[in-house]
Amino acid sequence: MNKTHLTQTKFADLPLEKSLISGLTSQGYEYCTPIQALSLPITLTGKDIAGQAQTGTGKTLAFLPAVFHHLLTNAQPENRRKNQPRAIILAPTRELAIQIHKDAMVLASMSNLRLGLAYGGEKVEIQRTKLEKGVDILIGTTGRTIDFVKQGVIDMGSIQSVVLDEADRMFDLGFIKDIRYLFRRMPEAKSRLNMLFSATLSHKVQELAFEHMNDPESIQIEPEVMTSVNITEELFYPSNQDKILLLLSLIEEDWPDKAIVFANTKHTCEKVWGYLAGDGLRTGLLTGDVPQNKRLKILQQFTDGEIDILVATDVAARGLHIPKVSHVFNFDLPDDCEDYVHRIGRTGRAGEKGLAISFACEKYVFNLPAIEEYIKHPIPCSEYDKNAMLDSLPVMKVTKYKAHPNSRKDNYHRTHKR
């Protein structure tokens, strides 16, 4: 745990339940990030918020302590039934829901509040069995949650707190009708603690907050600083045919402890993964086509250090919270400016330093002006020497969706041109 703190506000100085402070302290959390320092004093009084903050700013620990504190300091509704959770946290992707659940487990163990998960891609009976025993806090995606509501497995009639995480992404993925479906089945907004977090507080996000929340207070974390000061950005202009060789050369030069390579399409991700894995690098592939059980296994291997490099699409990687990612490579410049910020936000977290390297190739260089306008600064450009790059491409692996935890860096030998 890196002890670097971004504010002077301590969790222990906030009016949190002592058990929650103990849980946070046990995980090394002492000081608040800006989003936590601004939001918790508001939500701990029971007031709603709509918060704008980028990925990697500590949003999860801005809302989890507030939810737990609210349930611990307020009596549960009279005549509450077993199938009625007291709080619901909704995320746009199953990976983010799983990560939030993982972060919540420590607080749950210190407070005796029961957690439940609801997301697609896993056998429904496993989740149903857990929910039928009764949970206090349900964490999930909208689709599977609605399925359980329609089946009577859960009922929204006793909800006392609601969190919408990455609300802008929910709009992008077309989930807002689902969100409204669930809101209509909850008690009125005035009887709940409501929290919304989004990378942007666009008009449509603010409209959602106005419609389903109780006069939320808007908070923004330095919106003019779109990228973290902890991230060093670097830009190369490779030709299309040089991209793979340049990527391999940069990886060999730096030997990242933990890196994520982003590409714009599933096909490109598979190709990049094939060359990296074929070169003996411990590499995992994360796209929407990878079966859920394999995705979870690959993510765990990456988190545990059994895999050094993750090749991913934006949809598959959005919302992931993986500590100590040292490098992010934009193999393709994204078409969406916000995706650039989300991608490089995988590194430089919690005070750690990170490096974000982007390739402006012939196909995607036209995305660069809009990205630089959005982040309000030019990305520093570096040149590469073709004569210093690797001689040739490795044989590309064709077996898909498999990580390679058994190969080792010290077995990797390549020849440079000199």
Swiss-Prot record:
Against SMART domains, the record matches this protein to: DEXDc, HELICc
Q: What is its EC number?
A: 3.6.4.13
First-level EC class: hydrolase
Q: Domain named Helicase C-terminal: which ranges?
A: 243-390
Q: Which stretches are annotated as coiled coil?
A: none
Instruction: List the Gene Ontology MF annotations in alphabetical order.
Output: ATP binding; ATP hydrolysis activity; RNA binding; RNA helicase activity
Q: Which Gene3D superfamilies does the record cross-reference, listed alphabetically? A: P-loop containing nucleotide triphosphate hydrolases
Q: Which CDD domains does the UniProt record give? A: DEADc, SF2_C_DEAD
Primary location group: cytoplasm
Keywords, A to Z, come to: ATP-binding, Cytoplasm, Helicase, Hydrolase, Nucleotide-binding, RNA-binding
Q: Source organism's superkingdom? A: Bacteria
Where does it sit, as one GO cellular component term? cytosol
The processes (GO biological process) annotated in the record are:
RNA catabolic process
Which positions in this protein are listed as binding ATP? Answer: A53, Q54, T55, G56, T57, G58, K59, T60
Q: Where is this motif: DEAD box?
A: 165-168
Q: Subunit details for this protein? A: Component of the RNA degradosome, which is a multiprotein complex involved in RNA processing and mRNA degradation.
For this chain, the family text in UniProt reads:
Belongs to the DEAD box helicase family. RhlB subfamily.
The record's PANTHER family line, in alphabetical order, gives: ATP-DEPENDENT RNA HELICASE RHLB, ATP-DEPENDENT RNA HELICASE RHLE-RELATED
Function noted in UniProt:
DEAD-box RNA helicase involved in RNA degradation. Has RNA-dependent ATPase activity and unwinds double-stranded RNA.
Protein name as catalogued: ATP-dependent RNA helicase RhlB
- Organism name: Psychromonas ingrahamii (strain DSM 17664 / CCUG 51855 / 37)
